[in-house]
Amino acid sequence: MGSRRVTVHHATGWDGTRLHYELSGQPLGAAPVALLNNGIGCAGYVWKYLRPLLEQHCTVLHWHYRGHGHSGEAPDGAQYTIEDCVRDMEAVMDAAEVESALVFGHSMGVQVSVESALMLPERVGGLVLLCGSHGNPLDTFQGTDRFRAFLPKIQQFVGENHMLVKLFMETFVNTRAGWWVARGEVDGRLMNREDFEPYLEHLSKMDPIVFLRLLESAAEHTTDDRLGDIAVPALVVGAERDGFTPYEVSERMAAAIPEGELLTIRGGSHTAPLEQPQLLEMAL
């Protein structure tokens, strides 16, 4: 296989936010488009093995949310919602001259992807929903809803100690200790630090206030009563040992989408696309 050709571009979001996106794989217009929606606090680490596979058959459009990666922050510092992400996704598609795409989402990217199929039905040709919820993820995080009650207190603490929290994240998150803590939520037998480190590195540099504002929106957002309106095929990937998105959430989502299909990753965690990429390759 030859070297990958990736071109870097920028779009302007609905409120003027500068948005980073990349095109790779097949020439635009010569193949279907696969659009990748990241999780919160992520800039694409989870697509390491899936993206090259897609590039063999598709034009891959990968972009960064506002306040993430190489994209800018919202001009007013406040507009960080799931719906804002969908509007930004539309702006990126417009800038790239992409009419319709097969939309992939991981973690919070599942919420963005599902909402995009409802807000932009003519732009979404299908969904691949990986290890994420269709709404209210903090109500099921680790099998309990207690984390949602903690969020306002965390937001208050970070707001009052912003620079201190930023310094802590910069010095602790992307360290051996940070990896040791993270291993408790992934399959340490199949996940190596090299694959996970880009996530820790990105998170360590992210503004915690931006992270929490988007997390607040994700916690309140749901499409639970609208899944039946999704008019495109959807492959829902659920991992048996996913503490962030319990497997039962994926089961319910797949059953509620008219053309939904469930793929089970036996023994997989929230980072199953990195732990067992061969299963996704066979399914896709």
Protein language model regions, located:
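Conserved alpha/beta-hydrolase "nucleophile elbow" surrounding the catalytic nucleophile
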Residues: 38-40, 101, 105-110, 239
